[in-house]
């Protein structure tokens, strides 16, 4: 029946989305626990040369996944944030400090200061409750890979409501509900 088809399609979409996010999440998890990222997170005195060497690990993750917009890594002892898109800066000068605030949602859609919508994945150490690595996934690229059969250019999936929204321009969402 049509209802069974709709439920099956919806379940397939959820599985595809979960698999796509898991691919990024597992690669980021491995990066988070790599010796280079651990050194970058925990070093009390790190030279620019060492930092550049360790940053290659973050750039490797960024370059192998087309959905990743940016990666931030926080060294709390030196109060430094290292990024793949804007170099490094002190945490106090960092323009996206809220990215390191605890996030209790599976997916949190938020807007970066330069108008890029992202899904944010946060990683913390075992004993640490504050996020120390953030992976921002470009929603447009990610959702475009899932919704290939539509002319829409903007998508939002709200997992708590199991609802998808799309738009064909810069108009306010929701324009069309996809489920």
Regions found by a protein language model. Give the residues of each.
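Solvent-exposed, acidic/flexible segments
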Residues: 21, 47-51
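Short, glycine-anchored, charge-dense loop/turn motifs used at functional sites
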Residues: 77-80, 155-167
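Extracellular/periplasmic juxtamembrane segments that couple receptor/chemosensory ectodomains to their
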Residues: 169-179
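Juxtamembrane extracytoplasmic/periplasmic/luminal helical "stalk" adjacent to the first N-terminal
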Residues: 1-42
